[in-house]
Amino acid sequence: MAIECSYYLEDLDTRELPRRFLEAFAAILSHSNYAPLLDAASRVGLRCSRCAVTCPVYQASGDRRDIPCDRSALLLEVYKRYFTLRGNLSARFGKSFVLTEDYINRMAEEFYRCTACRRCKKECPLGIDHALITRLGRWILAEVGITPKALVVATREQLEGETHNTSAIPAAAMKDTCEFLEEDCADEHGLEIEFPVDAEGSEYVFFPAVSDYLLEPDTLMGGAAVMKATGGSWTIGTRNFDGINYGLFYSDRLLGRIVSAEVDELRRLKGKKILIGECGHASRSAKVGIPTFCGGKNAPPVINIMEYTHKALVDGRLKVKSGAISERVTYHDPCNIARSKWIINQPREILEAICKDYVD
């Protein structure tokens, strides 16, 4: 069975692939806390498929392989056979599951059909986190060389390339963009904004999704306008100005390296707090990853731009025009920052303050 999508930059080494997969699986279990999750999930015989009701992928495809509990069963089958006493005994005394290259290819295809939105966890009567199991499967696959090309290219450039960001934007180009946005904001909106660069000792070091410099200039201008209006002390670093962290989607090891690089930039600039842009996955990876990999309780605080804006609004440091937006507006919760009950009410209260017809 061939993998339907092209995953590799280099040719995949398929020699003893099942053995290498199991070795990677064993190493991850030894150096992480995934074992209790898998042990609990593997003891549950229930596959009621209630998760299918909330899965947007299954609702669109109708394909049974997109039912979250069925996808989780692929990795749990491997775990039960090779990492539990019952599985080892059944292999000795009778027929049992055998991991093959075709089975690994099937996992590679099906694990990357999941968006990892984690809606299924909310529906599961036993609270099984199918997205987390899927992500663990992706991590094991990554350790044996099976990862989608786009993720590999972007992450390599971020960690090992000259630009240290996923879009390969040179620092000089980033600074040119910021200067242009300052002029554009003044011309279009009559607002004087600034993008401080490499300003040591700032309270906040800003890490937006680097793609904002190419695709979402209004988002950057809005953030700069808020910082200007509130007198915020902030800066953008030239050695690392990318909050994107694709490790969140497929590798704890790489997630840790990326958030560590953010903390290194914070320390280089003698900043106090990390300020993340509106990007959901960039926010979640920093909020969860920095305490995990960079000092625990002593890790630098991580603030999302919506949290900063909301606090400034509540404190009276940010003045807005009530009813400035007359059109009907609603808010779609980003799964990465709302599913964990982190940022829910703040954006709604901001919108209510500036929208004439906000509907929730």
Feature-to-residue mapping (PLM):
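Short, catalytically relevant binding-site loops at active-site mouths
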Residues: 282-283, 308-311, 336-339
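Short cysteine/histidine-rich zinc-coordinating motifs and their immediately flanking basic loops
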Residues: 57-70, 126-138
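Iron-sulfur (Fe-S) cluster-binding modules
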Residues: 1-53, 57-60, 69-70, 74-83, ...
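Iron-sulfur-cluster electron-transfer modules
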Residues: 15-17, 25, 34-35, 39-42, ...
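Short acidic, glycine/proline-enriched helix-loop-strand junctions
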Residues: 283-306
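Active-site glycine-rich loop that binds ribose-phosphate moieties when present
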Residues: 256-264, 308-317
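Residues at alpha-helix caps and immediate loop-helix transition turns in enzyme cores, especially N-
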Residues: 67, 129, 133, 219, ...
